Amino acid sequence: DYWQDLQKLPFLSSFATYPMASMLLAAYLNKLGLFLLSQFLWYIALLLHVFLIAIFTWKYVLKAEGLSLTPSWTVLYVGLAMASLTQGVVHQPFLGYVAWFFALLLSLILYPLFYRARRSQRLPDALKPQWAIYCAPFSLLLGSYIRLAGSDAEGWFVALLLLLSQAFYLLVLCLLPRIFRLGPQLSWSALTFPLVNTAFALKLGIDYLGWTWLVWLSHAEALLAFVIVFYVCFYYTVSLRARKITKNPR
């Protein structure tokens, strides 16, 4: 069943969250002094992500009769920028920049496609929580650019990425009421990373630019992300518990 689900377009594109999370885990393991383990995990995660991009592109882009776009496409293609954010694990800035420019290019390609497809391809209700993903790409690009370039990052470009990420974040905030009115969905998990990532990127951006007058906004976005993550985790816990009780009645 799981393998059949993985063959479906929305699931296969979302599966890229696993190598992304693995690269992030590698960064934490590296901080704990587990250097060999973290580097091994990072390279395996990068190879898995590239493999998923190749399989998905071949099956759903090159061989498909038409493009069936969902927001989770950005998880797959732009999510590779996680390698840029965490390249310090393996000290490979070249790989980081290659991944970053790839993610930037795909962002510039995908967003116009999403705009064109917004009416011709209606997103099913079960996938509408993926709308939250719209704010993730430019936030991830912002955070990874600052981490990659360090003090050499161009201030105007940081500001541009910051404004773009916040613009899409505002769009997501406007869509949240429509998402929650649909009722509980398994795809609520799509609400977590984009909101956390945007709050994290905002903090990095305002720290780099010295925009201390926006600290309150950083705190507000972090608080909202915490509330959403807690709520989604609570929903999953209750749902899994209910299923367990149903299958194993006492």
Regions found by a protein language model. Name each.
Residues L34-V50, F94-L108, G155-Q166, A220-A225:
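Structural signature of hydrophobic alpha-helical transmembrane segments
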Residues L52-K59, L85-T86, I109-R118, L140-R147, ...:
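Alpha-helical transmembrane segments in multipass membrane proteins, preferentially the mid-helix core
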Residues L202-V238:
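A generic transmembrane alpha-helix motif of multi-pass inner-membrane proteins
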Residues G143-I146, G150-G183, N197, L204:
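Long, repeat-rich segments with strong aromatic
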Residues A27-Q39, L85-Y97, Y145-F157, G205-W216:
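Helix-coil boundary and interhelical linker segments in multi-pass alpha-helical membrane proteins
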Residues P137, Q166-C174, V227-C233:
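Predominantly late transmembrane helices and immediately cytosolic-facing juxtamembrane segments
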Residues Y2-A27, W42, Y60-L85, W100, ...:
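Juxtamembrane helix-loop boundaries in multi-pass membrane proteins
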